[in-house]
Amino acid sequence: MEAETTVDSLLKEIDMEMEMQSGNDVAQSNGYLLPLQEIGDETMDMLVQYNTENNANSNVNANANANANQWNKVDDPQDLLPMENNYDDDEEQGDESDTTNLLSGNKHLTEEESEQVLVDSKNLVLPPSSSKSNLINNLKQVVEDEVSDSQLSNDMDDTRTLNFSVKGTEPLLADELQDKEPDMIEVSTIYDGPDMISMADDSDTEDIDLLSKAKKPVSPSKIPITNAQTINYFKDAPVEDAKLQTVPDDIPLETKQTTVSNDILSNVETLLPPTLERPSFVISNLKEASQSVENLGFPDYEEDSQSEQETSVLHHTPTDFHAHEFEVFATELPDINVTPSIKPIDIDNNCEHENRLVSEEESKGVISSVPENENLPAVKSNPSSNSISDMLEIRQENKLDETLNMIDHQLSSNKSIDSVKTVSDNNISKSANDGSVEDVADSGKETSDIARNIEESHNSLINLTSGNNFDQSMHNDLIEESNTRVNVTESDITASEDSFNGSHDQNSSLNNLTKNDNGIQQNLEDNHTGIQPEMVVPEEVTTTLPEVNILPASENMLENTSESEISVQFLQNRDNEDKVSSDPQLEENIRSTETVMNTQETFEPKPAKKNQYTDREIEVLNSQKDISEATDNSAVNSRISSSASNFTPVLPPLPKLEKLSIDDPFDDEFETSNESMQMKNSVKPTDYLSIWHLQEQTTKAVSPALSSNSQFSYNSNSTKSSVASPVPATAFKFKPKIVSRSKYYYPDNNIQQEQSMDFIYTKLPSILDPMRRNTINSKKIRQTVIDKRKSHPSFSVDEGNTITEVNIEPEVKVQPISIENDSSSLKANNQDDNESCSSGSQAFVTPSATMDNFDSQFNELGTSFENDLENVLNYFDKDINTNTSSDLIEETTTKNQALPTSKVWSESVDYSLPTGEEPNVDHNIMKKLLNTENSELNECRSDQEHHIIDNAGLGIWRSTANDIATGNVDMFALNGRDISISKSEMTNDIDMGIFSDKKSLVHTPELSPVKSTHVGSPFKVISPKKNTQKDLKDGTTAEKRVSSESEAAQISIMSAVGEITNKDTAVVDDASNKDNIDAGQVGNEGEPIVDKGLLYLHLQGTTKLSLAGINAHHPKYSIEFDNGKNVVRTDWTELDSRGTISLNKEFEIPIDQSINKLIITLMIKYTRLTNELVEVTKRIPIGKKFPFGKMKYRTETQFVERSTVKDEWDYLFARDGSFGRCEILLDESLFEKIRFKEQDLSFDLLNKWSRLQNNSSSKVTQEALYDLPRRPAYKVGSLKVKGCFLERVSNDEKFPVSLKKAKSIVEKYRSQQDITKEGYLLQEGGDLSSQMKNRFFKLNGVELVGYHEVSMKPKIRINMLKVVKVIGKDDVVTGKDNVRNFTTWVLMNDCFQLVFDDGEVITFSDESSLADEQSWYMKLKEVVELNAFHQPWVKRFSENMIINDI
């Protein structure tokens, strides 16, 4: 607006002047005079600028009063005008001089007259009045030409030439022969710039100044002028303006290698192993390789001279540096390609070096010669394809060693003939496939010994079977099978030697097998000529051959799997990885053909006896009533079990077993429905025998989707084929699903249950069921019985149907129960077949009729019944036949100090004591069995699980909830509830017949029933419930205490899985609870307060005391402070002569229930007066005027010192010097005045010890002085006090020792509340899990709130009172010597952390600036340091102080 107003005012003034002078002006006869208002502002400005440049000497200023804006040379718009040189220098100078003279001579001309003079001087011919606009344009062009010419001339004059001489530089390495001085060098340069002014003569100084002024014209306008030139003027500016020097294009540029590429190469070289030589690299085209490093690659090795072509490829010298080694190096360098960038090197030198390396390697024999027309293999080769044969050879050697060791161990222990034959088959078949001549020879020697041992074992088997009443038909079959196996074994030995000699030159056949699965049979035909694939192998031979169960070699593979099939297994594993399954029929043909090839014998086809082996076997099994079809076993299974575990006995021949694991792509591993399981009758297989029985039972039904010859199907009478068909049954590439199998395979990370399926009686789950007990000795004994029954099934037929029931009549009266060794007390009852356990197992059965009396009579027993019941259960759990010496019992008893026992809730239960038929029952045996440690049991479990998993590759079979147990927690069912009993420890002197009084019973409340389908995790720990009853009597809490150590063990009742509670910890808990109750503490919330708080009294002083004669007695005072418990006195201090006391003493008094009042006493001691000044009046006679006149006297008063008769101070003080006392009642009215605030108080000092003086002038003794009657109490002064009461609300509060420190703490608290800051921070942690976000944070005292960076909604609120410390880069210190960890310091360099009291850490970082981040760190650290002053009393005290200040 100001600019527009200025322009309008100027235009108005010009118009007014033009109107005033229009009548007086006369037109000139020689031309037309143009009015000034028609020229225009733009043209007028150019005219003024022109006149200013050409009239610099006359100091012409177009507008002297205006505030002109000077333009810089860079901003001069004249530089933008075209530069034309249409005039000569002489003519231009003449015109300028003429124009200057005209204008300078007529200083009083108007603007129009000046314009006319300018037109006349230039000889301009103006057009008529009708073309005024053309005149203006012509005039403008003239001015532009003049300005351009003057600027060009000035620029040309500024350029000068500078010549100078420079002395040459002496060489760095001086030559003694050369004594020449360095030559002088002439240098000529063009110099221009403002410094030339200083080089000019003095006479030209004025012209140069005028010239410099002309280059900076003054604008006549008052409006500020802004140049519209671009800011980035260097972008498009010419080279002259930017003063940049460029390099000519003809000079070649040298491409320098980047630092990154150099570092990469150096890193690769440093990562090379010390045994390898550094690789040398040759770049064919240096220029292209340096410009595109990413395109470098590693081609095949070539020994011809083609590396000099323009291929821009990096060649590798043929040294020991291989591709797979380089891949390892590349993986250690992040963000680096496999092809590194390499420094440009000399091509010739590198070629020489490469040739030298090649020659050296060839001389050493490292590099083999390759034909010129062929290329070496690529650098990056596939190790899996090149090393398959090596892997198989190593693996076969290892397996051979393990097999030989196993054979030695089994021969030494005289194992059965089946296990020996199985090992020999594995050994010989392995030797046939081994690639080492020495190993085959060794195996041949071993097999010769094996053959001899086989014969011995065969004879022993004949004796064994004949002595055990085996069926004669089965006996003949076993002998025939043994003979067949011996023949096959001997033939395999020769076959292995021949096959090795025949296939020594064809060791690459196995690699050919890996290329194509369809070429397996063709490969067999190439390696073994003369064998026809259509040959029919007799069934008798086929059944004796080792069966191939193709399992993943890296997971679980049975030890008894024939090693002759290792190549087929490897192929199958590779096919499984590629998700392509081979045909089952084809694999069976391969196995059959390969077995015949190994034997190198020609078998004549014989008509096989249809189902001869199976029928015989089934007839024998059907004759045994105690053995069901679910427990059938085969001779093959017997061999597998004997080789897989050392503790499993020899099994009778049973039907063939299918593979154990399921490699089914359709199988659901995570199915937990257990639809085919009985929840109450689940089995937990503990050994191979139980697993095989389970499989035989669950695989009876054959799925119609399975082929008759599939290796995954069950080979029964209906599905087994007598002849192996070479035609596959189906073209389906995946393995069929076994729909009849009801168990699922689980990984090894679960806990395997050790209860045997043979000893679980599912129909009678009872508390007295001994088969649910699980201890070491009983487990071993039961396993021995199982082995005997399975080895000799003919003797266990009658025993399988026998169930022993022993009932003891319950007695109401408490008395010991002893176990007698009399067999007459035992009653044997035969039960029906439907109540017997499968596989001929035995169980002690408790009749259901006794369960009715169980609840009614159990309460009448003592608490120690739980201990005796545990002994009874352990008695069932142990086998009484165990022959253990007394020395072993004593040794075990001394070692095992902690005895496991189980507790049962106090309910009346009828029970029975089965004792068995064995007459030799010793109490020491029972004691030894009870002393078994839990650790020993766990060790046995872990050893057996490890043995089973290692030998057989089996996992854990999941069971139902009723059979899951964790640790040593045993569970049983009672009244429809699943109960787990935690074992506690008890002393060694327990007698199973001793019961305690029923008065000390600890009752346990009943729990709600748990669903039978509930499956608890074995890793879930549920804390035991302490079953204690508390009786409230007279407002006090009491607890019934346990009388003995055995009764102090707590009872833990849980629904599924519980944790073990030891008696020691339970006793400690009971003792701690008892002490707490006796002390009257009921917990943290109801914990009594230590005191009411702290009372601060600041004694300021007293008013003037009503005490005379202070100066004469020289008194001293002291203050006595009595709170009812302690008495405190101050030092004796001189009393002021004015009678005022300035105390300035502070006392802190903890207020509790015993303190009701405070007594403050002022005590004074003084110096007793011995002499005193007495005023005496004397009469002095005056002379008589008359002789008989009256005698006249004058009086005169005098002070006479005499001994003191009595002192007034003697009647004012008590014996101890007490003079004044005030009593402060500590009541609520006082606390209300001074609670959490400082208040002025005043208390009267009363003298209660003043006595009445007696009127007699006689001197009173000191003893009689205190017997005088006392005066009534009177006020002698006032005590001024400042008081403050800090009330306690928590025992954790800490009060300062003085009121002054309390005030300073409040000040610190206030300063903490005043700390504020806000800004953006990056947060990691807290509510952000594994991520980092930018938020806007506000710090207000102890509250740090984070807001969303856009919406500004609060997202997180951090209580700084919970922060323990703030960690920055300077706070990371470790070690005793406070040595800083440099790594942590680097990581914490750009962030800081808040560490909370629970260990949580939140990291913050500020990206804006380091100063801002340091400010955040310092403020947060100050807040955390001031947290120590953050107590409840501080906040209240601070609030009251603010109110008082207002």
Curated annotation (Swiss-Prot):
Residues annotated as domain PH: 1314-1425
From the Swiss-Prot or TrEMBL record, state where the protein is found.
Bud neck
- Cell division listed as a keyword: yes
Composition-biased stretches (Acidic residues): 86-98
The biased composition feature labelled Polar residues covers: 425-434, 495-524
Q: Where is the composition biased (Basic and acidic residues)?
A: 1028-1044
Query: From its record, what is one biological process in GO terms?
Result: axial cellular bud site selection
- UniProt-listed SUPFAM superfamilies: PH domain-like (SSF50729)
Keyword flag Oxidoreductase: no
Name the predominant localization: other
Chain positions covered by the region annotation Disordered: 69-103, 358-385, 425-446, 495-525, 823-844, 1025-1044
> Which UniProt keywords are given for this protein, alphabetically ordered?
Cell cycle, Cell division
**GO CC term (a single one):** cellular bud neck contractile ring
**Example GO molecular function:** GTP binding
Question: Which protein family is named in the record?
Answer: Belongs to the BUD4 family.
UniProt function note: Required for selection of future bud sites. Cooperates with other bud site selection proteins to recognize a spatial landmark during mitosis and they subsequently become a landmark for downstream polarity establishment factors that coordinate budding and cytokinesis. Involved in the septin organization at the bud neck.
Q: What name goes with this protein?
A: Bud site selection protein 4
Tell me which species this is from.
Candida glabrata (strain ATCC 2001 / BCRC 20586 / JCM 3761 / NBRC 0622 / NRRL Y-65 / CBS 138)
Q: Which gene encodes it?
A: BUD4
